[in-house]
A protein has these predicted regions:
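The catalytic "switch" region of P-loop NTPases
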Residues: 1-117, 166-196
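Winged-helix-like regulatory helical subdomains adjacent to P-loop NTPase cores
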Residues: 113, 117-122, 130, 134, ...
Length: 241
């Protein structure tokens, strides 16, 4: 759970208290460019300090590389956008704007259109930072599992990096487990009755549908494909309780 600037909340006659029951974030740290850079540097410093303690001489980006073929393809798309901008066909104010904004969504769209679908790789230091959404624990816990998996694969050989495939598998599994565990936790906390069970079911469905809609927007041709918030414009059928 993430709550912004809330100190406590009641739950089944018990008190929710940080940091045990939820993680607190300031939303501007997730969406503000400067705050994102600060958070990224903060994580980078943590990773590199920990690498030094286990005698690994590497920076965070080298230790957590993105899938090389993915980087190459995205860079090609970026160059196409930069070339279009130089011809006066771009949307952004600067040459890099469209390249940075649309290249990755276009790459994901390209993957989804293939008959034999290749999967997008959730790998690379910067991507893992973004996925953690401003919560340090959501970066470090998967990283710990990646490191252990790499140790097994290396079979005693020194670890100089985490394979992009290991990063991707761990992140995908963590995401599935996180979604599942949150609802299992919620089901244990609420009173067992049909009303609460139905509300949990509706909440799960809402989150699933929102995710599907956000994915559709990401693959669309809209000028802005990143969605941070939403509103319900017609709440006539929404349960008020």
């Amino acid at each position: 759970h993430t709550l912004v600037d809330h100190k406590d909340k009641n739950r089944s006659n018990n008190r929710i208290e940080k940091p045990h029951d939820y993680s607190e974030i300031v939303f501007s740290y997730v969406v503000s460019s400067q705050k994102k850079r600060d958070y990224c540097k903060f994580i980078k410093d943590i990773v590199e300090r920990r690498l030094k303690t286990i005698n690994i001489d590497s920076d965070a980006q080298t230790f957590l590389p993105e899938k090389e073929s993915q980087v190459t393809e995205i860079e090609k798309i970026k160059e196409n956008y930069r070339e279009a901008w130089r011809k006066g066909e771009g949307r952004g104010n600067q040459e890099s704007d469209d390249a940075n904004r649309y290249s990755r969504p276009d790459y994901i769209k390209m993957l989804s259109s293939k008959k034999q679908k290749a999967h997008y790789s959730y790998s690379g230091f910067r991507q893992l930072v973004n996925i953690s959404s401003g919560i340090v624990r959501h970066f470090l816990e998967p990283l710990s599992k990646m490191y252990e998996e790499q140790k097994v694969k290396n079979n005693g050989e020194p670890i100089i990096k985490i394979d992009d495939n290991i990063q991707n598998i761990i992140i995908r599994n963590e995401s599935i487990d996180f979604f599942k565990e949150q609802f299992e936790h919620l089901e244990k906390e609420v009173d067992k009755n049909d009303i609460h069970e139905e509300k949990i079911k509706k909440l799960k469905n809402l989150i699933t549908v929102l995710g599907e809609n956000f994915h559709e927007i990401l693959l669309s041709d809209l000028s802005e494909r990143r969605v941070f918030s939403f509103t319900i414009s017609d709440d006539s059928n929404v349960d008020k309780e």
